[in-house]
């Protein structure tokens, strides 16, 4: 309970504070009449008394005028309105009887982004707008506004939610496709007209405002109920969640692309480091490794054999190898018994009695080494070996390598009878005579390999390998043969492309009648495919149901061509690319909306009171009608009941709300028809008989500005039925059959939607946000959200009422 109170308090203080008790925030308000600076200098408009004296009111007269906001003023309006989904149109007006005119219009070229219109011809208020899918929409609200009386009108738009108030009474509340306020540059703002030639409003307007805020109707009618949160608040929350999901998907896609680019970085130049034996070296840095002089170049270690110097050594020294170094260095020597010994070398001397004495070269003198005793040997004396550098014998097969050796990498230590020596591994050669340092033999560079044609020799440490060139497959370790990807179907050509094998690869070329890069080919139709047709082969269009012809340019009249057999209780009505069976007079649909009209059932006029039989007759229901029967023996008057009033037999009258329809009572039956127009009669009603109006001022100009129509002429323009009536053009949406289905599509160049079973084909879906999708990364997606499929760059997926629909953009593929 407390949470609901807090939420309500929050909504009242923060959501409605700008309206209730605190006035309207000027940054959220567009006062149209004030900003347009209307005055005596404005042609066709003059100031008059209004409904109240608080603000100015203006009379829009029946004269040529151009009430249009300047470019700067219009842009100020649009900065407040652009990309907003919560706003209200407010106006106080008094419209001339029977006038059909535009209250305000925001449009760019022929695209009406927001237009409010009142038709006195058809007694309805219309809202024209464009949705986020860039389709035009018209919402019609039946209401008599053009009655020469004062009215307060407010139209609140909250995302996909519309509320129409008139005189502070909620008249209509609807859920529609969300209007788009993504207004492009060059959009114009008109008041009281659509443009210089059409939609002239006639009457008085006062307090014309646009409030960019929730439930702006409160400013006009403070006592109206408020709701919190609004539809736009809810849409905003869902949108934020979808945006976060989109950010996550885009981030994942960017990461995937970054990984791919990192794999291609070796094609780019950048400073690269080298690592050898745990040490990292920078670009161009050099160092000595054993008998090699190495340098880091572009991330690769390049080594050359070290050239050793040959220095002159001082007296009592000579050149000798030093542990851990490749080149010889000067080292102290000793002369003993006619031989030369280097510092640290030992030698044994045996006395005549067989006693062993050990000497070591130290400080240029052979010095006696004290004996520390020898370990006992476990081999017979015949297997014992005398050593030249030790008084202790060893057994045959002794492991000298385990004691100490100077063999470096790529060199192995080998045991001889009395010492250890170094030997280069297979595939390596010695860098000095003792084999302590060895280098790899590059069999590829020296031609010491066995790789045959169609292969490339790659050197490896101590060996080499033969790899196949691109487009070839391996036969054995040393040879490869040609690989025909076209024959083995190991190519990436489109099914509508031809594969041509080349040396080491293949080429893809689209077949005649198809366009693309070979890996993606699309059929090409020279004249295009109209009315939603699809080009499926060279100059072959697959036409949607209801159209025919090479380019699907011809509408099939299913009604006259006999393709459709409507039920006897229905009439066949042809539509562009479609048809429907409409219940005949005296019948109505039972709610099943069957395509052939089987759901049309008889209206029981007698039971529902929809008959005109007088009280002295008895109503008998008939199939598709009724009969007024006089009881036997009774003298009936033949009078009729119409709109609750008695009409005498033979009486003729004009309908109250339609002065152009004449009704008569004939023996209990009311028959109504349009007034017969006699253009020779000088008193003919030109409103009902506009075709009898000869005045040039009553002509109308077509929306394209090229065709002139006489009063009474009708035409179809952008899925709207238009009529010229005494110089005024009035247009209303073409009637479409009810579409009671979850998924529908509005084919190109058609005016009425059709039902489809596949949600991926649908462009209009009754979005149910409770239905979610689970994408390929197990991320929950809301209905309406879209994302780039993981691991791809050109596959766009969308969640449609729990169904995942994906499509590939061929142009995107070509740009990769």
Swiss-Prot record:
Domain Laminin G-like: 64-228
Binding positions for Ca(2+) per the UniProt entry: 440-441, 443, 459-460, 463, 555-556, 558, 574-575, 578, 602-603, 605, 621-622, 625
This protein's GO CC annotations: cytoplasm; extracellular region; extracellular space
Domain VWFC: 272-331, 638-693, 698-756
Main location: secreted
InterPro entries per the UniProt record, alphabetical: ConA-like_dom_sf, EGF-like_Ca-bd_dom, EGF-like_dom, EGF-type_Asp/Asn_hydroxyl_site, EGF_Ca-bd_CS, EGF_dom, Growth_fac_rcpt_cys_sf, Laminin_G
GO molecular function terms attached to this record: calcium ion binding; heparin binding; protein kinase C binding
Signal peptide (from-to): 1-21
Localization (cell): Secreted
Residue ranges constituting the EGF-like domain according to the UniProt record: 397-439, 440-481, 482-522, 523-553, 555-601, 602-637
Entries under PROSITE patterns matching the protein: ASX_HYDROXYL, EGF_1, EGF_2, EGF_3, EGF_CA, VWFC_1, VWFC_2
Keywords of the record: Calcium, Disulfide bond, EGF-like domain, Glycoprotein, Metal-binding, Repeat, Secreted, Signal
Glycan-bearing residues: 53, 225, 293, 298, 517, 548, 615, 635
GO BP annotations listed: commissural neuron axon guidance; fertilization
Cystine pairs: 401-413, 407-422, 424-438, 444-457, 451-466, 468-480, 486-499, 493-508, 510-521, 525-535, 529-541, 543-552, 559-572, 566-581, 583-600, 606-619, 613-628, 630-636
Subunit composition and interactions: Homotrimer. Binds to PRKCB. Interacts with NICOL1; this interaction triggers epididymal differentiation.
PANTHER family in UniProt: NEL HOMOLOG, PROTEIN KINASE C-BINDING PROTEIN NELL2
Function: Plays multiple roles in neural tissues, regulates neuronal proliferation, survival, differentiation, polarization, as well as axon guidance and synaptic functions. Plays an important role in axon development during neuronal differentiation through the MAPK intracellular signaling pathway. Via binding to its receptor ROBO3, plays a role in axon guidance, functions as a repulsive guidance cue for commissural axons, helping to steer them across the spinal cord midline. Required for neuron survival through the modulation of MAPK signaling pathways too.
Descriptive protein name: Protein kinase C-binding protein NELL2
Organism: Pongo abelii
Lineage of source species: Eukaryota, Metazoa, Chordata, Craniata, Vertebrata
């Amino acid at each position: 309970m407390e949470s609901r109170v807090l939420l309500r308090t929050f909504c009242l203080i923060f959501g409605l504070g700008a309206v209730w008790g605190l006035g309207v925030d000027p940054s959220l308000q567009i006062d149209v009449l004030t900003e347009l600076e209307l005055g005596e200098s404005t042609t066709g408009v003059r100031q008059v008394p209004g409904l109240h004296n608080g603000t100015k009111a203006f009379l829009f007269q029946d004269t040529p005028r151009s009430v249009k906001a300047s470019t700067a003023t219009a842009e100020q309006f649009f900065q407040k309105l652009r990309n907003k989904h919560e706003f209200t149109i407010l106006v106080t007006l008094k419209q001339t009887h029977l006038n059909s005119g535009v209250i305000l219009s925001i449009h760019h070229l022929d695209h009406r982004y927001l237009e409010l219109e009142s038709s006195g011809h058809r007694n309805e208020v219309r809202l024209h707008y464009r949705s986020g899918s860039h389709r035009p929409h018209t919402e019609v609200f039946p209401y008599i506004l053009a009655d020469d009386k004062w009215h307060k009108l407010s139209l609140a738009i909250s995302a996909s939610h519309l509320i129409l108030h008139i005189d502070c009474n909620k008249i209509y509340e609807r859920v529609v496709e969300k209007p788009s306020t993504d207004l492009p540059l060059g959009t114009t703002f008109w008041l009281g007209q659509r443009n210089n030639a059409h939609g002239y409003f006639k009457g008085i307007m006062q307090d014309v405002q646009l409030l960019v805020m929730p439930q702006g109707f409160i400013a006009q009618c403070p006592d109206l109920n408020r709701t919190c949160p609004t539809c736009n608040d809810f849409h905003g929350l869902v949108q934020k969640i979808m945006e976060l999901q989109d950010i996550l998907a885009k981030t994942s896609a960017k990461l995937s692309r970054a990984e791919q680019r990192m794999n291609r970085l070796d094609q780019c130049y950048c400073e690269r480091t080298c690592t050898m034996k745990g040490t990292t070296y920078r670009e161009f840095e050099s160092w000595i490794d054993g008998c090699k002089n190495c340098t880091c170049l572009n991330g690769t270690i390049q080594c050359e054999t070290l050239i050793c110097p040959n220095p002159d050594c001082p007296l009592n020294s000579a050149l000798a190898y030093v542990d851990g170094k490749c080149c010889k260095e000067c080292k102290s020597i000793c002369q003993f018994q006619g031989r030369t010994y280097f510092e640290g070398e030992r030698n044994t001397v045996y006395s005549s009695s067989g006693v062993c004495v050990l000497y070591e070269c130290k400080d240029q003198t052979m010095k006696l080494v004290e004996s520390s005793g020898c370990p006992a040997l476990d081999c017979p004396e015949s297997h014992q070996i005398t050593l030249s550098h030790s008084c202790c014998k060893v057994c045959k097969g002794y492991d000298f390598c385990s004691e100490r050796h100077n063999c470096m990498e790529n060199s192995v230590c080998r045991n001889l009878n009395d010492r250890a020596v170094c030997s280069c591994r297979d595939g390596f050669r010695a860098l000095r005579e003792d084999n302590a340092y060895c280098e790899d033999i590059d069999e590829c560079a020296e031609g010491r390999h066995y790789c045959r044609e169609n292969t490339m020799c790659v050197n490896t440490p101590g060996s080499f390998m033969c790899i196949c060139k691109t487009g070839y497959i391996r036969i054995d370790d040393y040879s490869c043969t040609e690989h025909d990807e076209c024959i083995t179907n190991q190519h990436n050509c489109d099914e509508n492309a031809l594969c041509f094998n080349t040396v080491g690869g293949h080429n893809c070329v689209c077949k005649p009648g198809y366009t693309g890069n070979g890996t993606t080919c699309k059929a090409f139709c020279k004249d295009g495919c109209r009315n939603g047709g699809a080009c499926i082969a060279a100059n072959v269009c697959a036409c949607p149901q209801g159209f025919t012809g090479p380019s699907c340019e011809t509408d099939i009249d299913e009604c006259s061509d006999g393709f459709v057999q409507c039920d006897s209780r229905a009439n066949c009505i042809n539509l562009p690319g479609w048809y429907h069976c409409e219940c005949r007079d005296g019948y109505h649909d039972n709610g099943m909306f069957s395509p052939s009209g089987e759901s049309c059932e008889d209206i029981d006029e007698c039971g529902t009171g929809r008959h005109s039989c007088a009280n002295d007759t008895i109503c008998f229901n008939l199939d598709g009608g009724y009969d007024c029967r006089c009881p036997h023996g009774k003298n009936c008057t033949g009078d009729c009941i119409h709109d609750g009033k008695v009409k005498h037999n033979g009486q003729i009258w004009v309908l109250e709300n339609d002065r152009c329809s004449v009704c008569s009572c004939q023996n209990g039956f009311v028959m109504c028809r349009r007034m017969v127009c006699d253009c020779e009669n000088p008193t003919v009603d030109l409103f009902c008989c506009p075709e009898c109006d000869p005045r040039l001022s009553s002509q109308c100009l077509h929306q394209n500005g090229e065709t002139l129509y006489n009063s009474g002429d009708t035409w179809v323009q952008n899925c709207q039925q238009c009529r010229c009536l005494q110089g005024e053009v009035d247009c209303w949406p073409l009637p479409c059959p009810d579409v009671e289905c979850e998924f529908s599509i509005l084919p190109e160049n058609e005016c009425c939607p059709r039902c489809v079973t596949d949600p991926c084909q649908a462009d209009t879906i009754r979005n149910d946000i409770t239905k979610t999708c689970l994408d390929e990364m197990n991320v929950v997606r809301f209905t309406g959200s879209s994302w780039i499929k993981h691991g791809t760059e050109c596959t766009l997926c969308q969640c449609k009422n729990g169904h995942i629909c994906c499509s590939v953009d061929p142009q995107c593929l070509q740009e990769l």
